[in-house]
Amino acid sequence: RLKLNKTRMSQSISLYKQLANHKLFNKTINFDLTRIKLVLKKLSHPERKLNNVINFLGSSGKFTTLHSVKSFIEANNQTATAYISPSLKDIKERFWLGGRYLNHTEIKQSIKLIEKTKVPLTIFEVLTVIYIVNAAQQKVDYHLVEAGALFAKDSTNVFDFPLAQVVVNINKQHLNFLDKNKKTLDEVIYQKVGFLSNFTHIYIGKQTPYVLNKIKKNLRQNKSIITYANTWKLIKKNNHYFYQDKKFQIKINTKNIHSMGLLNNLCHAIKIALDLKIEKKIIEKTIPKITFEGRFQYLNKGKIKN
């Protein structure tokens, strides 16, 4: 098993090196939707085949919120693809196809397909196209898509009519991706929520009062349904945490989640799952099984190297 894991790791590293050293692909970060839209056009618009897309964007909590929503969907005997970044151990972790990960051979085949378009892309754009062309071939109920650093010109912002767009906590984490004269929290907020769809359901996660006020100003003209985090709360009773809204109270029975931020992300996902008509009893049974690998995770075995 150890030998197999080393082989997979070697294959993953090899694929990353192939992308990094590719003459057509660029290692730098360059936000622009023109390139990826041209590739998608040349590939006959596979993004239009993705039904029920849910975008996850923001600064902190995209993966944990997405993973929780995916866990609830799958516990409800439904299926979902998922695109996440970054991967923790293997490149294929980025591409979930509703029951399995994309394998290394399929990733290589997808790269060859993209090469034929002869359009220069950034590596993140390549990874996004790999996800889209493979997700388009899957018959699933939902497609869960995690954005990169920002959203305005992020390569995941290519779906015309997403089912929902989930905004997690926004902070100064991505200031370094902004122009020199625009490195402000206000600009981060604008880049993330100022370009959301007018034809979807927007969910806003827990924010500081300042960020929340700025988000509301940015969304003032947005025509979408908007659900803010004041519609639910995380409460503690008798040493137990609960999700609570006007209709439901759900016990957060978990030994795997070790921070208030992650608990709030879980609650945000519970709200979304309830709106997707997933029953309370299914959510309650699923919560103890949810783990966030590499996120405030206690390691009880294996060697830790200094």
Q: What are the language-model segments listed below?
A:
Residues 24-28, 175, 304-306:
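Acidic/glycine-enriched edge-of-secondary-structure segments
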Residues 4-79, 89, 119, 201-203, ...:
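N-terminal leader/targeting and accessory segments in enzymes
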Residues 6-7, 299-306:
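Short, intrinsically disordered, charge-balanced linker/junction segments flanking boundaries
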Residues 8, 29, 33, 40-41, ...:
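ATP-dependent carboxylate-amine ligase catalytic core
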Residues 36, 66, 107, 111, ...:
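A general structural signal for well-ordered alpha-helical segments in protein cores
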Residues 36, 69, 73, 128-135, ...:
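Buried hydrophobic packing segments
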Residues 53-55, 80-82, 165, 225-227, ...:
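Conserved beta-strand scaffold positions in the cores of enzyme catalytic domains, especially
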Residues 138-146, 153, 162-291, 295-302:
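Acidic, Mg2+-coordinating active-site environments of NTP-dependent enzymes
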